[in-house]
Amino acid sequence: MAQDAITAV
């Protein structure tokens, strides 16, 4: 997805 934020830290 283009609107994908980094949710994996």
Swiss-Prot record:
The protein's topology relative to the membrane is: Peripheral membrane protein
Post-translational events: Contains one covalently linked phycocyanobilin chromophore.
Principal subcellular localization: membrane
Residue ranges crossing the lipid bilayer per the database entry: none
Q: Where in the cell is it found?
A: Cellular thylakoid membrane
One cellular component term (GO) for this entry is: phycobilisome
Q: Name one GO biological process term.
A: photosynthesis
Q: What keywords appear on the UniProt entry? A: Antenna complex, Bile pigment, Chromophore, Electron transport, Membrane, Methylation, Photosynthesis, Phycobilisome, Thylakoid, Transport
Which function does this protein serve? Light-harvesting photosynthetic bile pigment-protein from the phycobiliprotein complex. Allophycocyanin has a maximum absorption at approximately 650 to 653 nanometers.
Q: Assembly state and interactors?
A: Heterodimer of an alpha and a beta chain.
Give the protein family. Belongs to the phycobiliprotein family.
Name of the featured protein: Allophycocyanin beta chain
* Gene that encodes it: apcB
